Amino acid sequence: AYNLAIPEIVMYNPLIKTIAPAGAASEPRDPITEAQQRWIRETPHTAQRAAMLLLYSGLRRSEATALTWADIDLDDATITVSKGYDFRAKKVKIPKTPAGVRVVSIPKVLVDYLRTQQDGCLYVLHNPKGRQMTEQGWKRLWESYMRDLNVKYGYDGQQNKNRPGGLPMLIDTFTPHQLRHTFCTLMYFAGVDVMTARDQMGHKDISVTLGIYTALDKKFKKKKINRLDTYLKKSCANSG
């Protein structure tokens, strides 16, 4: 597997606040910020394993739900994706397109984390009984996760998340799908070519990947030109 270097980068704030149910309208695809990535890495929670997996592999939530430890080769730093969980039918299904079946290379930060997480259960992500996560299970898990992050980073740990009436959200929350999109964005900044990114993400049509890369190109075009100016300035100075 190739070495997937994932840098920490500052990205624009997410807008979405909750998990969209399966089959609902598409969620906004804003990547999460560098600070939010750090929250995921540094905050122990039952949902941390799911968040780390989605953020640093780009798997779909359905793919992550169906994932078993046998699908992960930590020595080779790869995940074999061959199935997904249908939340409506409540059963595992094969991907809708050949592109969905793939081997995903994962960065060292995820490999090292997963080495500490093997717990003897069949599924990588599971409920307290060791079974696959349901839609409701995901919803409860993620709501709890956002509440904990809100207490720690919004209130500096000075409030009780179970306070009667609840706590207003002071942080920008994010969804599992945003973590998948963030992984694609990280690949862009790491210089991963669009064909490799398409394979990693399991996009049926490369135009989807190209659309993401093109949008990022437009957003950061000025910064690239500034780097060119800096390079040319140094080059001209050295030749003079």
Residue spans for each PLM region:
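Short, polar N-cap/turn motifs at the start of nucleic acid-interacting alpha helices
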Residues: 71-78, 173, 192-214
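Proline-centered turn/helix-capping motifs that create local helix->coil transitions or kinks
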Residues: 5-14, 73-77, 114-116, 121, ...
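Basic, Lys/Arg- and aromatic-enriched nucleic-acid-binding interface segment
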Residues: 10-67, 75
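Short, charged hinge/linker segments at domain and secondary-structure junctions
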Residues: 2-27, 82, 156-167, 226
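C-terminal secondary-structure termini that scaffold catalytic or DNA-interacting sites
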Residues: 76, 89-91, 95-101, 105-110, ...
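Short, basic (Lys/Arg/His-rich) helix/loop patches that form interaction surfaces
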Residues: 39-47, 57, 104, 119-123, ...
